[in-house]
Amino acid sequence: MESSDQAARWAKTRFAEIVQGGGDIPLDEMAFLISAIVLGPGSSRVSDSSEIIEQMSRLDELAAAVPSPTFGGIAQFLFTGPDAFVGNRAEYYDPENSLLTKVLDRHAGIPISLSVIMMEVGRRLGVPIAGIGMPAWVAATMPA
């Protein structure tokens, strides 16, 4: 594995390449790069492209487990039941609630990170789900 400095530089460089490249921005990859930049290598489990792919496979696995590939089916799968993702009300302002690697580990986050998971699972299943910015919140919806 790369040294901590090299890994952090790699994540920042990759982030800049994506932003400056024009075209579509891969939400999942960007979210994992943010985790790597904020937490640093090792603690975020994202320090090179192979680890990004490994983290994205976690979203692939979630999508593969959705029994009904519809907006409602995805929401029900992700947000109900014993292994549901939940809002972290007790520690709402914990920065880790915004970091996708940590949210996937803990199954707890804030509306924006939970919406990213829902949008990315939907994208993998061909179900269009968009984020809607609201004052102090983000919610997921089906585009018109």
Task: List the predicted regions and their residue ranges.
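A structural boundary/capping signal
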Residues: M1-A144
